[in-house]
């Protein structure tokens, strides 16, 4: 693997840095306090091409490789994880699933809107009673002539309040476990689908997170993505790449924590000198720096494997596991450097810690990642 970036990748990274500086950084505190990112950011993300990364230009995408995608999601994560999540879900989980599994009609209907920011997508997998055990969904899709009628509910759905389309997973057959799960593309204006915004989150407060309720939601059979019974495969393939995106966002959080800690330590004075002169402060900062580099390299390795068409799912779990835990450590250490000021939301490190904490939970908890890695190493499933 070449650890250097191409001119194109360097340019994309700089484009993302400039975008964060111009469109995100000035608003982060206000969005966090209001629990509401300005939705106009979606269109801006589309205009700059970030919602079309790795998607063929034929369908409105901006092309590029997965390392470029990781560079962008890292920078967005450095700026505001609530905004990064918009891209990771609408592009990473929804648009990329349509590109991989959809037929021509589905690609042409949904991809141009998703890549431009005209549409927002959400990923309807998690349920009130089903998180890690994603193969045991209770949402049902029953065939009725040329349609399916869907009943159930989904919980903690990123982009759920804003979404124009849900990539929805429901049990459509009586086959056991995950074999009975199918995937559907459901427009959110379909009769019977209602949404409730979830407020009071610890972190990602600006993100539009929702609970979805489906009562006799009728969709045509043509809304099914991939063959019947392949929904779990759609979900797992999406999450394998999604974990790479989350890992990249976590690198961004950790990098932001490092930048903040260094800046504060070299300015704040105690005992007649800047606190950077104190050995234990340098220890905190050096620990963050090592975590940043290690997490970034693990993430880049996944992107390299994806771009070369090699198996990557286990490496993606490793990257997500390490990077998410590293982001929590980094933000916590940065807060320690700040002392009491770090506990006030006028300073960035408290939000970094709040945002980092959920990264160890969604798209597979740290414990689930360890089971995935352990299964790959031993050949024994502990699920």
Regions found by a protein language model. Give the residues of each.
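Short Gly/Pro-enriched turn/cap motifs at secondary-structure boundaries
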Residues: 87, 114, 129-132, 156-159, ...
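A short, Trp-centered hydrophobic/proline-enriched beta-strand micro-motif
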Residues: 117-125
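Conserved hydrophobic/aromatic beta-strand scaffold that supports enzyme active sites
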Residues: 122, 136-140, 147, 165-169, ...
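Flexible, small-/acidic-enriched active-site or ligand-binding loops
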Residues: 136, 189-218
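A short core secondary-structure module
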Residues: 146-147, 151-195
